[in-house]
Structure formats: C-alpha cells, structure tokens
Amino acid sequence: MHAIHPTREQDYSEWYQQVIREADLAETSPARGCMIIKPLGYGLWENMQQTLDRMFKDTGHQNVYFPLFIPLSFFEKEAAHVEGFAKECAVVTHRRLEAKPGGGLQPAGELEEPLIVRPTSETIIGAAFAKWKAGTSHFLGQNFARAAEIKFQNEAGQEEYAWTTSWGVSTRLIGALIMTHGDDDGLVIPPRLAPHHVVILPIQRNEADRVRVMEYCERLAKELRAQPFGEGRVRVEIDARNMGGGGKTWSHIKRGVPIRLEIGPRDLDAGSVTLGRRDRPAQQRESMAHEQFVSSIGEILEDMQSRLFQRALALRREHTREITEREEFERWYAGAEEGIHGGFALCPFVDDPRIAAQLAALKVSVRCIPFEQAQRRSACLFTGKPTDQWAIFARAY
C-alpha cells in the first residue's frame, strides 16, 4: 500500500498534485492564477533562498530590490523577450478606488501610462543598469542592453553594448524537488532544505504516560536542538496532537520530514528512541540508544543528504542517452516505441540559428551546455559540422 494515489507510474500529473495536497504545501487563492504557500512550502522556499543567497554572495554579488510594477513602455522595448508571457500579465490602469453611488467601489484616477505587474525582472533592471557605473539562467546577448542603453568602455576606449545574462530561481524549485525526490508515499525533503529535520511523535495510552513521555520528548528535543548541522543547528518539532491509528506518523511521512522519532513508555524505560528515515521504506524502523542517537544526528542527516543526492544522480543518468545520429534523436522524442520516453539527450551540437525550426518541430530545446565536456569530436546532429561541444536536449513541460 502507498499513501499517494495514483502512483507516479499510474498518473504522473495527478500524483504530483496529490503530493502537494497531502503534504499541505500550498492551496489556491481567491485571486485567479495565484496560490497560497503554506508553512511547510514557505519553509522550504526560505531555506532555498538562504542557501542560494550565500552562494551568490560568495561570488561577490550584492542584493538589490526593484519595484513590482513596470511601465508599459519598458515592456515594449523588448517585445521579443516578453512575447511568451505577455498575455499572462496583470495590468494596473488606475491609482485609487472611490465609492459608487448606491454602494460599492469603483476604480478612479486613471494612470497616464499603464503599469505591468512584472512576471520577470530583466526589463526594469535593464533600465536601471543604464544609469549605473557598474538576474532562470539565460544568455541575453545584447538585446536588453540595446533596448536600455547599457554600455561599457572596452580596452580600446570604445563604447560597446553590454552582454547580459539573467539568472535566478522561483518557487518552481519546490516543484523540481517534488519531482526529483518524491515517491508514492509523498514528499521527500533533503535534510539541508527541510524546515524541520526531526519530528518527535509522543505515544501515550493514559495521563500518567502522557506526563512522562512529554517530559522525555522535551528533554530529547532540547538536546537535539543543540547539535550542529549544515549552516546551523538541528531543527526539531514535537507533534503532541492526540491522533491514533498511525495517522500522525503517516502525516509526517507524506510531508517528507527526514527523521521521525516515535517515543513511548517502553522507549523511556529502555533509554532509547525508535527511528524512521524518509529515505527508506516507511515500514522500516530501528531502535537506537538515546545518547547514541543524539551524538550521531548530524552524521545521520548528512548520510541521508548524500544518499538522496546520489539517488537523484542515478535517476538522471538512467534517463540520459548519448545520441550521435539524427534518426535516433527523432525516435527518442517521437515516443512511438516502448521504452523510449524522450528524457535527456546528450548530443554533439553547433550553435546555429537555423536549427531552431528543426527543434521546434520536435518540441525540443537545448537545456544546457555542460561545463565538463567529453573532449570527443563528432558531427553536429543538425548541421553536420564537426564539433567537440556537446549539449543536453530535452522537452520543456
């Protein structure tokens, strides 16, 4: 039996929606197209932001903050870039509300120029960069630089338009985490991103048990919170809800908490804890001495982090095929043969604008060019030109 129905294999799209629902990550909001990110989902997002913020600052970058609104004229400067999502933009046309005769409210104070609620940041950042002497991952070439007049002085003292990139992330990373690590029992969270590393589940049959067990759980939580892990300390939650029938345990399995500790009177008497790890089958549990568990919690979490990472790498390797023939490439993405699913394709590639139409017909695009190249010369699948550059191709969904 599994906690999530349907399973990944039965209906991937519905499985994904059920994981979000059962993990209580988010829900729809009254505003169409918007969602409410709930505590677990937002805890994940906060940890992702903090981790990436450290990585960005390690490269010497600094943070800035830009307005939510973009003047329509800014958007129009780079029409090609916004074409894909222009129809999804919200537009602000008035600056206030006023009372209507007979009750209710109506917009008033029409703006001289409509404002776009920005779906992306390049246009407004580009306009500011033009005045400075000095964010997905895209090579934008000189498109935004020309539109926003961003120039620099080269070694010869001549002015040139800047070559710009855009890189950053959104809450879509949470979706990637679900798809990469989730299973048929729900969400699986790598420890370094988990809002809580350990959840303690007190088990008590009567009031006398409750007092003893809760005192033990509070002491255990305090000891665990003093242990270092990652950039901080172990984060612990005690779930003291009065639930029976395994419902409390399964709620945390579906929520992906890395470690579950079930603590009852027998554990107190034995000075032990009963441990369940989210990187292992839900039914698999082990008993550890109290002191041993506390002292080794950091090592256990690091082991889980490593196992999940290696599992993800193995999954990627399993779904990546090296292809050097155009016919095989087309079969890979046609999906007409059993066992051919169209995952990642690693192929020799020469960047040529004329290739775009060929890829569009297959609904495939270049996803990235790996830093580590095979240093093997082969013919580009699309131009036939010899090259030692290899690229990763895939479909975007």
Language model feature labels by segment:
Residues 1-397:
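NTP/phosphate- and nucleic-acid-binding module
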